[in-house]
A protein has these predicted regions:
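Functional transmembrane helices that form membrane-embedded active or gating regions
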Residues: 131-134, 186-216, 259-271
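Alpha-helical transmembrane segments and terminal signal-anchor/GPI-anchor hydrophobic tails
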Residues: 132-186
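Kinked, hydrophobic transmembrane alpha-helices enriched for aromatic residues
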Residues: 139-148, 200-227
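Long hydrophobic alpha-helical segments that form multi-pass transmembrane helix bundles
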Residues: 32-110
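C-terminal "closing" transmembrane helix and its immediate cytosolic amphipathic cap
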Residues: 231-277
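Internal alpha-helical transmembrane segments
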Residues: 1-43, 216
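Solvent-exposed interhelical
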Residues: 15-30, 113-135
Length: 277
């Protein structure tokens, strides 16, 4: 319940502003550097060379304990106030602690590079690229996952640093498997027709993300219906599917009457404030 990932995206997204005029090669190189998790490897090497080396204590555990207190209390006003103050701080510092901040910057740059190279355009060359990506990522996932499990058991500092880096890598490999698989399957008419509704959902991703958060908080938290203690995995999955289907219907209805989602429109206007766009 603490904070929101959008704060992380806003801060990490500044890397795109500073690299917007870089060449493709420089952007890809910067993405690789970030994705290698240099901060985690620094602490890992420092811990191996000096057993007394300790990771920075950002107090995330204590902050999340306080977040749990006001969330369980069920006071809506305290929840909102805590979430926009302490919750945001806890969420952001957790991301820094867990390697997510550097990872996010790297993923933004990787997405920037993919967009520049137009790799999502269904050309023969690009499809060959995604086939290779699928093969390499699928092969890399298993050893990365296994190595991550082994490293996690190898002492506190090594497990929390090298383990974090390897965890990010195996997740990146799995993500690329999913992305490449989707792109290749999308070339088949039946599959593309089956998932056609997702394009409406994607065009309103910000609106959907925030509305999901609001609905989820009302359904599960103490200030709302408080179904968390009574909903198991299956019930929660069904709730998620129901909310998703309702959102898809709403997106189709809204985009039939407007060019953008409501929050996407506000984001666009604020992004280009002072211009005619």
């Amino acid at each position: 319940p603490a904070g929101d990932v959008l704060l992380l995206f806003v801060i990490a997204g500044l890397v795109l502003f500073f690299t917007r005029n870089w060449g493709d090669g420089a952007i890809l190189a910067a993405a690789v550097v970030f994705l290698l998790q240099p901060v985690e490897w620094y602490h890992c090497i420092a811990g191996l060379l000096n057993p007394a080396h300790r990771l920075p204590d950002l107090g995330v555990g204590e902050m999340y304990a306080r977040v749990a207190e006001y969330t369980k209390a069920g006071n809506f006003g305290d929840f909102i106030l805590g979430n926009v103050t302490l919750g945001q701080k806890a969420s952001l510092l957790w991301a820094v602690n867990a390697g997510r901040f550097v990872q996010t910057a790297g993923l933004f740059l990787l997405g920037f590079y993919i967009g520049r190279k137009q790799l999502f355009v269904a050309t023969e060359k690009n499809l060959r690229f995604w086939v290779k990506t699928l093969i390499v990522s699928a092969i890399a996932f298993a050893p990365l996952y296994t190595l991550r499990e082994l490293v996690m058991d190898n002492g506190a500092v090594v497990g929390q640093t090298a383990g974090t880096a390897l965890d990010m890598w195996q997740k990146l490999a799995f993500t690329l498997v999913l992305v490449a698989s989707f792109i290749l399957l999308y070339q088949r008419r039946k599959f593309s027709a089956a998932v056609a509704g997702l394009r409406f959902y994607g065009r309103m991703s910000l609106t959907n993300y925030l509305s999901q958060s609001v609905i989820g908080a009302f359904v599960y938290f103490p200030f709302g219906l408080y179904l968390a203690p009574r909903c198991g995995y299956t019930a929660s999955l069904l709730v998620g599917i129901l909310v998703f289907l309702l959102q898809v219907r709403f997106c189709k209805w809204w985009l039939g009457r407007h060019k953008q989602g409501p929050l996407e429109y506000i984001w666009h206007k604020w992004t280009w404030i002072g211009t005619d766009k």
